[in-house]
Amino acid sequence: MQPMFDRERNGLDTTGLGLIPMVIETSGRGERAYDIYSRLLRERIIFLVGPVTETSANLVIAQLLFLESENSEKDIFLYINSPGGLVTAGLAVYDTIQFIKPDVSTLCVGQAASMGAFLLTAGAKGKRYCLPNSRVMIHQPLGGFQGQASDIEIHAKEILALKSRLNEIMAKHTGQTVKAIERDTDRDNFLGAEAAVKYGLVDAVLTSREVKQE
């Protein structure tokens, strides 16, 4: 059966286009077009979608710093739909969230796994949310290295040090003990929205716009 739209047959490859919607705003000065993410940034909304990489982390950090410079008193809203990614990239975002003056409210849409879950719980206390059917997954950091035995030992020590630090931070934000975090992240641990609230990863499940953005 021939697909309704064949990119190759029609001579159009849309893979790299992104298909990002544009928003047209009209004012006394005329019309202005924004991509949807730039328009939402004006409302102090940032998206972390997909893997946490150095590139995506730098984009989030830049937006956090920009919004702080625009207004250091108003909350920032970070929407997360991520399977996780680089620990160091995630820690860079985490440190920025803690560093800037505005509260950062986090919201899981879809999934927040691994480093995505870590950043979800890093939001301001009382302002961390999940949507009803979102999923959260926590586990210990993953790593692999090839080389001489002495180099492997060095990298193994680094992974263990990162694991210890991540557990301490998770314990701080969830209210769990470090031992509980170590136990519960030993293997992939999936939680629904309500279970994430009970564990302390988030503060509430949002079913409608009951929480008004400032």
UniProtKB/Swiss-Prot annotation:
InterPro entries: ClpP, ClpP/crotonase-like_dom_sf, ClpP/TepA, ClpP_His_AS, ClpP_Ser_AS. Pfam families: CLP_protease (PF00574). Coiled coil: none annotated. The keyword Hydrolase applies. It is found in: Cytoplasm. It comes from the Bacteria. The active site is at residues 114, 139. Keywords: Cytoplasm, Hydrolase, Protease, Serine protease. It catalyses: Hydrolysis of proteins to small peptides in the presence of ATP and magnesium. alpha-casein is the usual test substrate. In the absence of ATP, only oligopeptides shorter than five residues are hydrolyzed (such as succinyl-Leu-Tyr-|-NHMec, and Leu-Tyr-Leu-|-Tyr-Trp, in which cleavage of the -Tyr-|-Leu- and -Tyr-|-Trp bonds also occurs). GO terms for biological process: protein quality control for misfolded or incompletely synthesized proteins. Signal peptide: none annotated. GO terms for cellular component: cytoplasm; endopeptidase Clp complex. The keyword Cytoplasm applies. Its EC number is 3.4.21.92. Its main location: cytoplasm. GO terms for molecular function: ATP-dependent peptidase activity; ATPase binding; serine-type endopeptidase activity. Fourteen ClpP subunits assemble into 2 heptameric rings which stack back to back to give a disk-like structure with a central cavity, resembling the structure of eukaryotic proteasomes. NCBIfam families: clpP, PRK00277.1, PRK12553.1. Cleaves peptides in various proteins in a process that requires ATP hydrolysis. Has a chymotrypsin-like activity. Plays a major role in the degradation of misfolded proteins. Belongs to the peptidase S14 family. This is ATP-dependent Clp protease proteolytic subunit. The gene is clpP.
